[in-house]
């Protein structure tokens, strides 16, 4: 599953492209959650992968073109603004804030495992503090649906930019090319792992 056909196309045209079904989930957590739920209900896959590009925090040691496995997603921009400050909403009335979702699925350790912030606006300063190394726009919705329905899943992201960097400096073409190669490697490894 890919957010856009731009991200999916290199995989679909590559040598591994015929080895898996490919769906587009759309951009944003809500669109991704809705389309993921639809695919899971209609197709009932044994395993589902979300793959796309992401922005990295400049200080975490990731380079553009690095692919990472997301092990935790934070719904980082769910909260309120008070006096110019972002306040994450508490979960179920307790002190836990900044809803997060962990991936319990065991997968081959091919890539560095990181936490990610899911945000509606790339580079937004309106977010909760977290231990995330990267940001994307879909992951929390994907994690929530797959977790709720008990479907094994994984999320791969290839770094196209640094958070806050102007879009002209992003390396989207290089990132989606690398992502296609790494998705193929990951699919092969999952099949051997199973």
Segments from the language model and where they lie:
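Gly/serine-rich nucleotide phosphate-binding loop at the start of the catalytic core
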Residues: 1-7
């Amino acid at each position: 599953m890919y957010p856009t056909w731009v991200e999916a196309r290199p995989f679909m045209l590559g040598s591994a492209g015929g080895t898996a079904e490919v769906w587009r989930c759309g951009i944003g957590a809500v669109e991704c959650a809705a389309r993921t739920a639809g695919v899971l209900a209609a197709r009932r896959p044994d395993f589902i992968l979300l793959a796309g590009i992401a922005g990295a925090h400049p200080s975490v040691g990731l380079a553009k073109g690095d692919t990472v496995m997301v092990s935790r997603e934070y719904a980082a921009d769910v909260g309120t603004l008070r006096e110019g400050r972002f306040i994450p909403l508490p979960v179920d009335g307790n002190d836990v804030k900044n809803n997060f979702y962990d991936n319990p699925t065991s997968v081959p350790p091919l890539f560095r495992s990181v936490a990610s912030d899911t945000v509606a606006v790339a580079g937004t300063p309106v977010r909760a503090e977290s231990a995330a190394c990267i940001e994307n726009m879909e992951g929390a919705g994907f994690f929530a649906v797959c977790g709720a329905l008990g479907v094994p899943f994984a999320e791969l992201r290839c770094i196209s930019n640094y958070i806050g960097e102007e879009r002209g400096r992003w390396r989207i073409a290089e990132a989606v090319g690398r992502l296609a190669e790494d998705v193929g490697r990951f699919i092969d490894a999952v099949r051997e792992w199973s």
